Amino acid sequence: MSNVQGLTRSALDEDDELFVGYGFLPSIFPYRMQDLYDRSEELTPYVGVVLENQYLKALFLPELGGRLWSLYDKVAGKHLLYDNPVVRPCNLAVRNAWLAGGIEFNCGMVGHHPFTCSRIHAAETKLEDGTPVLRMYEYERIRKVVYQMDFFLPEGSKLLFARMRITNTTPYVTPIYWWSNSKK
């Protein structure tokens, strides 16, 4: 707001408010809350998928939303991401359960997406040159979109490649929000 000659005037144009709240989710339905966890330290096995070459070793956890849990630099001998030794959910996501560690990939809505602590689909495919690709994907039921994440680590590469795709399955414009986060 600005004050011009004693009058209060909005800094927004008259059409700017049309999109205030656009895409806001009043409910997480049809997903159920994930609040049946505790803060105990019991061991729980998770299935991991590894992409590795002479420079890097990447560990993904499809059971925890496809999170890149670990990225290890073999030459420097160090972890490039926050190396959390435990998986301990807490109430920070749209379905409650969220955990710290690695890189989280979020699709569909503001806030940690519905699958941050849920299993998503994982498959192996290949690039045209034969490079293995880890493909993880899921159908997000609120936005009605399919999102796909492809990761590959070619021989001789010092870079882990990520290719993301979001497909709208409806004939309508769908508000979408994509973000990733990590801590080092």
Model-derived segments and spans:
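Intrinsically disordered, low-structural-confidence terminal and linker regions
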Residues: 1-5
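Catalytic cores of glycan-processing enzymes that make or break glycosidic bonds
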Residues: 6-12, 47, 134, 161-165, ...
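Intrinsic disorder/low-complexity signal
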Residues: 14-15, 72, 82
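Short Asp/Glu-rich motifs
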Residues: 70, 92, 112
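Polysaccharide-binding surfaces and accessory modules of carbohydrate-active proteins
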Residues: 76-105, 131, 161, 167, ...
